[in-house]
Amino acid sequence: MNSLRMLRPAAIRVALASRARMAQSAVVLKPSLNSTTRIITRPLSIKSLFASKGDNDQSTSIKQPILSQDNLFHPLSESPIPEIRDRATIIKKYGTCPVCNEEHHGDRASMHSPEFECPDCGHPTHCCEEHYHKGKAEHDKICGILREHNEDEHDLRSGRPMKEFEFPSAQGFDEAINMANWDVFFYTRSFPSMDSDRNMRHVSKLLTYPITIGSVLHESSPYKKQVTPEGLRSLAAIRSILYPKVILAKDGVTMLKTETVNLYLLGARAESTLPPHIWLQLSHLFPQTPFHLHFIGPDTLPPNREPYTTFLNDRLTFTYDNAMYHDYHEKIGSFDPYRDIYFLFAPGIGHPDSREAWKPSIAKALDTKCAMFITGFDQTDVQTDVKAVEEDHGEDFDWILKPTENHFKSLKHDINLQDLTQAICANWGIWGIRGKRYEVTHNQEDD
C-alpha cells in the first residue's frame, strides 16, 4: 500500500469514467502518535455533483426525487444508483477480506475478495458470513462511518433539491464575518440553514479548500494562539493588501481594487477539480482583492492536457499546470511576501515515495520568503510531514503557524475503496512555515 498515495488505478478510472476525474489523498482510520500511517488512494468526484446549473437545467429542479429521505440506505450492490453499484464492484475486485488478511499475514495469494455485504453498513466487508461474524468486533469500529457514508452518497444522488448548496453572494458592507468554526461561519455569511449533520458534511467537504485558505488569512482567524511572532509579521504584510483603507472610485460608491494576491496551490489534486464558482466563497471574504490561483502539480490536469489560464470574473483568475513546482517557479520571476502565498493540501512531503520529489520544490518556495501553509489528513500525517521538513530544511525556515487541528476540515469521511478500514476527513490539521529571514546588524567597529 505504500505506493498508493500518488497512484491512479486505470481500472478504477474506467469504472468511474462518467464522473469527474479522480483525485487521491492518503487516509487512515484513527489518528495516533505511535501508529504507522497507512497510505491509500481516495476517489473524489466534485464537478459532476456541484457544478452550477445552466439555463437548460431548469427541468431537473421539478423532477421527482429518486430516493426519499427515509430510504437512503441500500446495500451497495443493490443500490438504485448505478455509480454506487460500481463502487461495490470496485471494492470486491480490489479489496481483501480483513480476516483473511490477518490469518494469512498479508499474503494476497491466500486471501479472498470481500463478497459478503454487512447488513448494517451495506458495504462488502468480508469474504463470507462466517468471517464477517469472526471479524465483527473490529468492523464495528468503522461500521457507523461506513453507514453514514452510504447514506450521504445516496442522498447526494437522490434527486432532492440541494438547498444547502445555494451559497450566498457578496457580504453586506456592514456585516462582519466570524471564522471561529463552520457553524459560526455559516451563520455570519448567511448560508442556508443547515438542518442536519448530513447537510454540514456535504457543504464542508466542498468548501474545506477555499475556506481553509480564508480562515488563515482573515482578520478573525481562529488560530491566534498558534501563530508565532514571525507569523504575525507575515500575516500583517498579507493583510495590509487584503484590508486596505477604503478608497472609492470617482463615482463615490465603487471600492477600488487592491493589488492581486497570488495563491500557489502546490501538488494540487482535489482542489483543482472544484468548479471555479466555488472559489467565489473565498473571494467574498476579501471583496476588494483580486486572486490568482495557481494549481500546480502532476495531478492537476489529465495527462497530455496543456497548461492554461482562465477567468471567472475580474477578481478570480485560475492557472492550471502539470509541472513540478521547482520547474514552474522559474516562470514566475519575482515574488513578494505581501502578495504571494503557498498552500499545500495533504502533500505527503514525508512519504517515502514522494519525499525526494518534494525537496527542490520546498526549497524554492522557502527561498521566496513567502508564507507557506500545509495541511494533513490526521495527526500522524501532519507530524510525518513536519519531521521531514525539519530534517530536510531545518536551517532554512521559521515557524509561522504551529501544527493544530483545522477548524475548517471536511466533516465528511472519505473511504478507501481498497481497504474499508481506512477513512479520513480532508484537511484535518494545518501548520505554516516561511523561509528564514536574517536580520542585518550594524557593527560599529567597521566605522
How does the language model describe each region?
Residues 107-112, 129-131, 135, 151-154:
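Short Cys/His-rich "knuckle" micro-motifs
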Residues 120-142:
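Cys/His-coordinated zinc-finger cores
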Residues 84-93, 108-112:
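Short, flexible, mixed-charge glycine/proline-rich loop motifs
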Residues 1-60:
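N-terminal mitochondrial targeting presequence
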Residues 97-100, 118:
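Short cysteine-rich clusters marking metal-coordination/redox-active sites
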Residues 297, 302-447:
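Domain-level detector for long C-terminal conserved domains
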Residues 40-87:
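N-terminal alpha-helical interaction blocks
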Residues 68-70, 91-94, 137-341, 345-353:
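Positively charged, amphipathic N-terminal segments that serve as targeting/anchoring signals
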